Amino acid sequence: MSTEENKALLRRSVEEVFSAQGDLDVADEIYAPNYVGHNPLDPEDVRGPEGAKEQARMYRSAFPDVRLNIEEQVAEGDRVVTRWIGSGTHQGEMMGIAPTGNQIRVDGITISRIQDGKVVEDWELFNALGLMQQLGGVPTPEEAQA
């Protein structure tokens, strides 16, 4: 696949699997059976298309209106780097935190490796502390000083 085709594959992942209006079954077309996803909020790696679907379900359950916007993509060889912004309303439990109704915004980067037209590995990096602060699970510096 060309670098442009690799970038398009990752756009499909963001728009069709992880955004609220997407189709989870598209994960079967995008992720290889041996897919491994590394995420700072998951103590264990995500595995296979079913693991990607489960991760997407978790975010969709916590943020039914979740939206991911791709800000930039860079591709070289079998790698694609996608810089994204996620937003949504906290309406379901997230990592033991009850719904707050808070609007959240998270900036992140995903580095993906493509093989034979499918994603075989992802490394996600995002502001997990900022997300937990927006959900009220961790005090902000201002709250901690009060």
Feature annotation, model-predicted:
Residues 1-146:
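C-terminal and inter-domain tail/linker signature
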